[in-house]
Curated annotation (Swiss-Prot):
This is ATP synthase subunit beta. The lineage of its organism: Bacteria, Pseudomonadati, Pseudomonadota, Alphaproteobacteria, Hyphomicrobiales. SUPFAM superfamilies: C-terminal domain of alpha and beta subunits of F1 ATP synthase (SSF47917), N-terminal domain of alpha and beta subunits of F1 ATP synthase (SSF50615), P-loop containing nucleoside triphosphate hydrolases (SSF52540). Produces ATP from ADP in the presence of a proton gradient across the membrane. The catalytic sites are hosted primarily by the beta subunits. Its EC number is 7.1.2.2.
Amino acid sequence: MAEAATPKIGSVGRVTQVIGAVVDVAFEGELPKILNALETTNNGVRLVLEVAQHLGENEVRTIAMDSSEGLVRGQEVSDTGAPIMVPVGNETLGRIMNVIGEPVDEAGPLVTAHKRAIHQDAPSYVEQSTEAQILVTGIKVVDLLAPYARGGKIGLFGGAGVGKTVLIMELINNVAKAHGGYSVFAGVGERTREGNDLYHEMIESNVNKHGGGEGSKAALVYGQMNEPPGARARVALTGLTVAEHFRDQGQDVLFFVDNIFRFTQAGSEVSALLGRIPSAVGYQPTLATDMGQMQERITTTTTGSITSVQAIYVPADDLTDPAPATSFAHLDATTVLSRSIAEKGIYPAVDPLDSTSRMLDPMVVGEEHYEVARKVQSTLQRYKALQDIIAILGMDELSEEDKIAVARARKIERFLSQPFFVAEVFTGSPGKLVALEDTIKGFKGLVNGEYDHLPEAAFYMVGSMEEAIEKAKKLAAA
């Protein structure tokens, strides 16, 4: 997609009404187009308004991208002649910007060669690549059981404290190492504290350099919980625009959205103020369209790919709620983080039975990978079914066959753990990026009983099977 040209400044209007985040502006001359950005100054600060509706002959209804406190009727507003334009390119790496592309990390101005409009059309059918490829992450449990599609969309489900952020950071790190790709993180309705923690953790784990520049691998775009709904409804698009630029440069980009539910929630807040009649559970009537317009832009083209990992909050654990239900329709894979696995000390705490992927198909991953993954899942499923018997009667009451299955399942569980690069700081063990062939080979040997003689402890927090064998020798010698 071509870079947008520098817009011509259009007509000047005046504020006629302010209702929270919605501002009406009257123009005497030409009316600005829908989605155009209007600018005014509010208490000495640049305030951007986005045109949402045309009312009558000379009035437009707009959504404010920042607080509208202090705005008065009669105040001058100018049309920029284009949608919101944000800086894109390598200069954005390691920096934090807001919905309108202004840096908010106190590391100086953000000057880039290109700016790009946040509203873009999805790539045409001709531009899209239809080839099904998996994106190897170097994380065993993901690559084996719920592989990510290159240019696919992954839903990341998990409560507080089970390791969503660490998994996100490891993915950023591994994609940069294995594919030389960049990442973009969009914090949508995030807690400011969490956003700040993520920024500093990225610097500590060498994902980014302080103040951006050479060596940084991720660009951050934040619209926190305290921002008006206009900013939260558009910040995901700002992040996506930065990611699209990298994709069009031929990169494999990882695009993180935390949290996709807040994008919908912000849209519903704005919708009511715009006078739209709400639909089911009070959501905006345009829910599916808003979600579809954003999700369709996340795709693989013939030049590069955007692979999106979206954290999804499920209100009241109700998966039939319109917001998560609309998100599910777009997902290619789900990675479910489980508290019960985290409690066993197994990290990443990915649930091997609940996580799914449409890429786990013999036509895509090959017969061997598919067979090994299914055997691993059936062994773990059998262990899960036997757990009640073990808890009541103990291991001795099981048949010999079941005892072997349980022993293998426990080894598989431990072998699904692995040390992360970004966790080196607090675990003290060096991170491991495991090649897909090594992952398949290791688990194939495990389910076929080749490693039944090795102790359970040898499989915990190692990378490849060779390391597990080495660890077993050390344990035997100790």
